[in-house]
């Protein structure tokens, strides 16, 4: 302690003859010997010199819309052209220029809705190139044939079919017997027509066959008669002439009977005609024998 002197003043020590205190040197920066957090600042300062690798930013790539075949046959593509000109009014003859302007205006509106990035001229060129694709051609065929393309078309067609089926069911329930009777009448008329045509063909065919057989037999009989005339007596000639006449009658009757027997509707008439012909033949034979 410093002793107080007179007049309230203290005697200051003599610092000139006192040796300086020796302090240990400072440890290097960021060394484990330093307990305080002062080493963090030099680290940051030293790290500024070296380049630190920065992770790349993730960029989200957006799908750029393209005018391809799938987009052209979509809901706003070619199927929408069926309804583009529903409200369009054309003036007709004498106003061709105005009608063409309205047509192009509606087409431009359709093209802008489908793909607004392209101009109308470029859009037309692109659509012309896409017209060779198979998908586009099938879509155009379905439009021309009025076939369903979109899901809405399928749903509307199914609804119409169900409604029609409901009406058909009620109609068939009410008019079941009428339709059956009408169908049976039509079937009977068609079958009768076909039968009559077949019968006519059979009759003509049988007639031709009978005539051919008759001519062949007549020729053979005439030749045999010519040979027998030089040998046989006149009585035999008369008997042969009668036999040839009978054979001709029998051939004619047989041909006629065949024609009648071939037709199913004339079976009864054919049997009666056969009986009459047989009776006539028997009568002629009895007359010749007497």
Swiss-Prot record:
Q: Taxonomically, which superkingdom?
A: Eukaryota
Segments traversing the membrane: none
> In this chain, where does the modification Phosphothreonine occur?
233, 244
What is this protein's function?
Plays an important role in the control of DNA replication and the maintenance of replication fork stability. Important for cell survival after DNA damage or replication stress. May be specifically required for the ATR-CHEK1 pathway in the replication checkpoint induced by hydroxyurea or ultraviolet light. Forms a complex with TIMELESS and this complex regulates DNA replication processes under both normal and stress conditions, stabilizes replication forks and influences both CHEK1 phosphorylation and the intra-S phase checkpoint in response to genotoxic stress.
Q: How does it assemble?
A: Interacts with TIMELESS (via N-terminus), which impairs TIMELESS self-association. Associates with the MCM2-7 complex. Interacts with RPA2, PRDX2.
Q: Which family does it belong to?
A: Belongs to the CSM3 family.
Subcellular localization, as worded in the UniProt entry: Cytoplasm; Nucleus
Region Disordered: start and end of each range? 1-59, 221-290
What name has this protein been given in UniProt? TIMELESS-interacting protein
Where are the stretches annotated Interaction with TIMELESS? 67-143
Under InterPro entries, the record lists: Csm3, TIPIN/Csm3/Swi3
Q: Among the record's GO biological process terms, what is one? A: replication fork arrest
Mention one GO molecular function.
DNA binding
Which keywords does the record carry? Cell cycle, Cell division, Cytoplasm, DNA damage, Mitosis, Nucleus, Phosphoprotein
What gene is this protein a product of? TIPIN
Query: Could you tell me where the Polar residues compositional bias lies?
Result: 221-242
Q: Principal localization? A: cytoplasm
| Residues found modified as Phosphoserine | 194, 222
State a single Pfam family of this protein: Swi3
What Gene Ontology terms describe where this protein resides (cellular component)? chromatin; cytoplasm; nucleus; replication fork protection complex
């Amino acid at each position: 302690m410093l002793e107080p002197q007179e007049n309230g003043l203290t005697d200051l020590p003599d610092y000139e003859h006192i040796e300086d205190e020796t302090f240990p040197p400072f440890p290097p920066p960021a060394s484990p010997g330093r307990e305080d957090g002062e080493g963090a600042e030099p680290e940051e300062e030293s790290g500024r010199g070296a380049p630190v690798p920065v992770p790349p930013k993730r960029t989200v790539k957006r799908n750029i819309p393209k005018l391809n075949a799938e987009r052209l046959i979509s809901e706003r593509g070619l199927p929408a052209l069926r309804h583009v000109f529903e409200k369009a009014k054309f003036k007709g003859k004498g106003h061709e220029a105005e009608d063409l302007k309205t047509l192009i205006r509606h087409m431009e509106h359709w093209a802008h809705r489908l793909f607004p990035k392209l101009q109308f001229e470029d859009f037309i060129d692109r659509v012309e190139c896409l017209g060779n694709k198979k998908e586009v051609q099938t879509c155009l065929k379905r439009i021309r044939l009025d076939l369903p393309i979109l899901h809405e078309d399928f749903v509307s067609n199914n609804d119409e079919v169900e409604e029609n089926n409901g009406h058909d069911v009620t109609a068939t329930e009410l008019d079941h017997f009428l339709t059956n009777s009408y169908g049976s009448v039509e079937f009977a008329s068609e079958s009768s027509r076909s039968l009559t045509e077949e019968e006519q063909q059979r009759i003509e065919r049988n007639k031709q066959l009978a005539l051919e057989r008759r001519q062949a037999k007549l020729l053979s009989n005439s030749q045999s008669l010519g040979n027998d005339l030089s040998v046989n007596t006149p009585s035999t000639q008369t008997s042969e002439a009668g036999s040839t006449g009978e054979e001709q009658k029998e051939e004619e009757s047989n041909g006629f009977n065949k024609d009648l027997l071939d037709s199913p509707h004339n079976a009864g008439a054919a049997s009666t005609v056969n009986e009459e012909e047989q009776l006539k033949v028997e009568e002629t034979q009895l007359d010749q024998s007497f």
